[in-house]
Amino acid sequence: MTWLAKLKLDYTRESERCVARYLHNGPLRILQSLYPEGDAVYHNVLVHPPGGLVGGDTLDMQVTVGAGAHGLVTTPGATRFYRSEAGLATQQVHARVEAGARLEWLPLEAIAYNQCDALNRAVFDLAPGAEMITWDITALGLPAADLPFAQGTFRQHLEVSGTWLERATLSATDDRLMNSPLGLAGQRCMGTLVFATGSAIAPERTERALACARDLLEASPLRLQAGATSPHPQVLLVRVLSPVTEPTLALLRQVWAGWRQAMWALPGNVPRLWNL
């Protein structure tokens, strides 16, 4: 039996309060809605009760953030792509962020289990004046549990429409990619943090954000496996590799908090779910 689960999530600003309305079909839904920062920023926890995907399963999320609204979405656990006997397992999100709106799309990691056949796809459309922060964290197997990613394929698609596109196909049997110094160098977790806008970022903001990120990277044990750059006038990136998930996640959380303060003058208070 395969699952097709859909969620439509719409944020709007009503007076000084951000509100959200959502519809779901199948096992994909909003578990909690919180205002830990006051009425202007709406935090949501997205859950998929089955806990993982196999061949033929699809999770489809459609998100709209209306003008002036600010939504933050996270998850209570990893997205697990299990062994696929037939067909592709797909998780996809398409988000539209309108002028003056902000979106923080911060799911926990995606785990590629041995013999998975998976696609993790995220597309973001940003209107002029819109801004967002997202990350993509991928764990290849579970090295600490001696469950390596020895066979299978994991596909990634991360796109800011008209601005930036990254696509990758990670084959477990591609030794040059998985283990060479020009590839993952034997690391089994990789993370990308993105700050993107619908208009060019002012040079002083870019410099401030990169300085913030680089200071944090330099102080990290992962400093030789991480970097910060601006590949496009509307995009800032931090990339990091680590042997397991926790160091990458911890470092990206630090930079996320720093960018929140530097770019939006908002505190980097983590969603309370992350402290459980």
Feature names for model-found ranges:
Residues 1-109, 114, 121, 261:
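N-terminal, charged/glycine-rich beta-strand/loop interface patches
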Residues 29-32, 82-88, 115-117, 143-147, ...:
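A short, polar/proline- and glycine-enriched secondary-structure boundary/capping micro-motif
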Residues 73, 132-136:
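Short, hydrophobic/aromatic beta-strand segments
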Residues 108-110, 135-140:
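Short, surface-exposed recognition loops or helix-turn segments adjacent to catalytic cores
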